[in-house]
Swiss-Prot record:
Protein name per UniProt: ATP synthase subunit b 1
GO MF annotation terms: proton-transporting ATP synthase activity, rotational mechanism; proton-transporting ATPase activity, rotational mechanism
Cell location: Cell inner membrane
Self-association state and partner proteins as the record states: F-type ATPases have 2 components, F(1) - the catalytic core - and F(0) - the membrane proton channel. F(1) has five subunits: alpha(3), beta(3), gamma(1), delta(1), epsilon(1). F(0) has three main subunits: a(1), b(2) and c(10-14). The alpha and beta chains form an alternating ring which encloses part of the gamma chain. F(1) is attached to F(0) by a central stalk formed by the gamma and epsilon chains, while a peripheral stalk is formed by the delta and b chains.
InterPro entries cross-referenced by the UniProt entry: ATP_synth_b/b'su_bac/chlpt, ATP_synthase_B_chain
Functional note: F(1)F(0) ATP synthase produces ATP from ADP in the presence of a proton or sodium gradient. F-type ATPases consist of two structural domains, F(1) containing the extramembraneous catalytic core and F(0) containing the membrane proton channel, linked together by a central stalk and a peripheral stalk. During catalysis, ATP synthesis in the catalytic domain of F(1) is coupled via a rotary mechanism of the central stalk subunits to proton translocation.
Residue ranges crossing the lipid bilayer per the database entry: 5-25
Biological classification of the source: Bacteria, Pseudomonadati, Pseudomonadota, Alphaproteobacteria, Hyphomicrobiales
Amino acid sequence: MLEPEFWVAVAFVIFCGIVWKAGGFDQIINGLDRRGERVRRELEEARRLREEAAALLADYQKRRGEAEREAEAIVANARAEAERAAAEGHARLNDFVARRTKAAEAKIAQAEAQAAAEVRAAAAEAAVRVSETILREKVTGDAAQDLIRRSLGDIRTRLRA
């Protein structure tokens, strides 16, 4: 009975009795309860934060998807607008070339007509001079001179028309 283990056990039982009598176990239990309550609140806070983070992530992903779709729509619209502008520019260029070609053809036709008229006029003038020269050599007298003048005037009018 005088063994040290025995006295350690007796001292422990007496200590536990004193602690129990002083309300130490209640304090330990209350402390553990408070700690458990604090842990439970922290877990609830963590759960709430996790749900909030999940909601924010979902919102972010939704907005990112919307932004990507909007960007794709903007790019598609820009591409369509560029193609339309290119087609419009091409059409304007073709129209410009067609108008210039038509104007050039009209100028060429006018120049051809003017050249043909000048050639006819020159040919008529040459024919009148040749006719006048021939008639003056062949026909003589006042009546002949009057006839030559009338004939040459008539020839000039007909050749110029």
